[in-house]
Amino acid sequence: MNGGKRVRPYMAALSFEAYGGKLNESVWRVLLGIELFHAFALVHDDIMDLGTDRHGTPTIHEFAKQTFKKQKRIGDLQHISQSHGILIGDMLFVWANECIFNQSKLDRNILIALQQIYTEMNQEVMLGQMLDVDGMARATVDDSHVLLKTSMKTAGYTFVQPLRMGWALAGSPKKFASFAESFGRPLGIAFQIQDDLLDLIGTAEELGKQPFSDLRDGQHTLFFAIHFYKRNKETERNLAKLHALIH
């Protein structure tokens, strides 16, 4: 739980209090569960991206590999450390579910509403991650592919679904779901675009990781998708050279 912005629980708390809710233990458990789900998603994402740094510290699987090397463990340490990372991510997912749903003080109808939203959030994240991984095996993707991936992988579970969960906790009507969609989806896409831009212009100290990590990992961001499809030939050659240099 080191570092991070806590955007998702903040969004849920904001919508909960905006509808008149008062924070209590049950609500705090849901907020913690949302953040634990985010931690689970990051751990698995780092493994799939072969990431080594997160918020200025080694990723879970990288920390495990470094530890195993110091202990002079034997075997395929890369595979073993990634396996540990997968299992730790799974455990975070279990804890997220327990925090959100193992509650006796929440109204049954509220729990049912939370379950529906949480399930939709899970599905969106998984499908978005599949698009992300699929893009890594493609030389180029167009901007519609990147926008769909961003909408599903980032915007939904960063803004749309946390807003909906906060309103559900407060017992609000389902009509607020459309507002969460129209407000949260564009905000989430903008959030990801800013993150992608910082990867290009930020420093290692500012980012908590090495810059150009997206390009190095073969990630197709909106900037590069637009450039590859709407730029001139000189820009195309320069981007291809940059991509080859980093790889």
What is the predicted function of each stretch?
Residues 1-247:
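All-alpha prenyltransferase/terpene-synthase fold signal
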